[in-house]
Amino acid sequence: MKLAYWMYAGPAHIGTLRVATSFKNVHAIMHAPLGDDYFNVMRSMLSRERDFTPVTTSVVDRHVLARGSQEKVVDNITRKDAEERPDLIVLTPTCTSSILQEDLENFVERAQLEAKGDVLLADVNHYRVNELQAGDRTLHQIVQYYIEKARKKGELPEGKTAKPSVNIIGISTLGFHNNHDCTELKRLMADLGIEVNAVIPEGASVHELKNLPRAWFNLVPYRELGLMTANYLEKEFGTPCIDIVPMGVVETARCIRKIQEVINAQGADVNYEDYINEQTLYVSQAAWFSRSIDCQNLTGKKAVVFGDNTHAAALTKILSREMGIHVVWAGTYCKYDADWFREQVSEYCDEVLITEDHGEIGDAIARVEPSAIFGTQMERHVGKRLDIPCGVIAAPIHVQNFPIGYKPFLGYEGTNQITDLIYNSFTLGMEDHLLEIFGGHDTKEVITKGISAGSDLSWTKDGLAELNKIPGFVRGKVKRNTEKFARDRGFKDISAEVLYAAKEAVGA
């Protein structure tokens, strides 16, 4: 166990709660001490949900430690069942309350005797998995529970839908642009003449889960959530799974061609080539833009990418393959799925980084001095400290990345949004320099610290004054070169003289 003040993927119970609260009329009960219950605040504040978060904390306090939890947990489940009338109550411990090693399965069985709705214990090992793995496991568990229940009652529908149809699996609360992506995927499916059989878990009722086997195929747009469920449905009912992420012009076309292949194999007769052609050439602006003079200005510029597997891999491919940008390194914090990530991006970048340590990522960014960063909220902070622009492309994210306006990342409209994000993330031409010449709003002081805490150098007043005279678009590089020169020569204070000496050394 390690103390962390920043985590890319949260603890396991956050993943379980994200899935449970995405469903309609499902209530979650968290068996946890106060302090583990920040999910309610996070969901209502960040994703701007209108409804109250359906999560109740069954608090582990000194009374519970003295007497045991059974009475309190069972009371909370039956009380919420009577008050809220949910279809399902999901009980989850947290990594903290798991230390008590209580028989929660027994508590659930006790509560089920009195509760009118279903009660389920989230089957997750809180020490072994993170938020993303736990979410995937919980979704699979809920789907399996209701399909088995329908099978026992003889209520499982037979056969497929009359027209080609799809289950979109993995849209959840607190996901990165998930609602916009869902709208765009529905629009894409409508264009292709495919009905949407179900979207899970976001907005779905647990009573609809028995209809999942009726779809012709399952689409899993995000690798982090939904693969276990899709694999289960494929194993049980033979429903094909498509896990190609339709992000960027090339991958969207590949995904559509795979859909064509899958539904034609089941008796349909469709050809989507004309649709792909029209969208690529006339509807999506990305293909046209990538050939324009604006985009050619970006050719060879250096960028770094970091995020979850889905978004980091897709962005790396788009930057390198579609826009000609040099990706110095690409990284992910999904260590459990590192092999897939390496396989996807190794030919599109110089180096692959797999880590959960934000300090290591910050240092890697400072080392390569890219023109732009594409990452999470943490990389945005790093970019601000290093004066390098950053486009946010993956969770974890802050409230400004839950936009109210329509901003999908998937499908053809998604390609436009991503192109805008990439282009606007690079500093344009002489922008900084012109602001300084004409006395614009750019009056910020020079940042003199590295990313890793505890810099051993300090700048004198005359040294800073001299550094401020250097144009903004090269100032960061000059500062770093000067600090390297000072370290090599053993200077502790960097004065104007040291700056001049460093300039001469570099010039020589």
Curated annotation (Swiss-Prot):
Q: Which HAMAP family match?
A: ChlB_BchB
Query: Which InterPro entries does the UniProt record give?
Result: ChlB/BchB/BchZ, LI-POR_suB-like_C, Nase/OxRdtase_comp1, P-CP_red_C, Protochl_reductB, Protochlorophyllide_Rdtase
Required co-factor?
Answer: [4Fe-4S] cluster
> Active-site positions, per UniProt?
294
> What's its EC?
1.3.7.7
| Superkingdom of this protein's organism | Bacteria
Pathway given for this chain reads: Porphyrin-containing compound metabolism; chlorophyll biosynthesis (light-independent)
Q: Which GO terms describe its biological process?
A: light-independent chlorophyll biosynthetic process; photosynthesis, dark reaction
Molecular function as annotated in GO: 4 iron, 4 sulfur cluster binding; ATP binding; metal ion binding; oxidoreductase activity, acting on iron-sulfur proteins as donors; oxidoreductase activity, acting on the CH-CH group of donors, iron-sulfur protein as acceptor
Residues reported to bind [4Fe-4S] cluster: 36
Its recorded name reads: Light-independent protochlorophyllide reductase subunit B
For this protein, what reaction is catalysed? chlorophyllide a + oxidized 2[4Fe-4S]-[ferredoxin] + 2 ADP + 2 phosphate = protochlorophyllide a + reduced 2[4Fe-4S]-[ferredoxin] + 2 ATP + 2 H2O
How, per the record, is the cofactor bound? Binds 1 [4Fe-4S] cluster per heterodimer. The cluster is bound at the heterodimer interface by residues from both subunits.
Q: Which family does it belong to?
A: Belongs to the ChlB/BchB/BchZ family.
Subunit details: Protochlorophyllide reductase is composed of three subunits; ChlL, ChlN and ChlB. Forms a heterotetramer of two ChlB and two ChlN subunits.
Keyword Zinc among record annotations: no
Provide the function of this protein: Component of the dark-operative protochlorophyllide reductase (DPOR) that uses Mg-ATP and reduced ferredoxin to reduce ring D of protochlorophyllide (Pchlide) to form chlorophyllide a (Chlide). This reaction is light-independent. The NB-protein (ChlN-ChlB) is the catalytic component of the complex.
What Pfam family is a match for this entry?
Oxidored_nitro
Keywords (alphabetical) are:
4Fe-4S, ATP-binding, Chlorophyll biosynthesis, Iron, Iron-sulfur, Metal-binding, Nucleotide-binding, Oxidoreductase, Photosynthesis
The residues listed in the UniProt record as binding substrate, with positions renumbered to this chain, are: 429-430
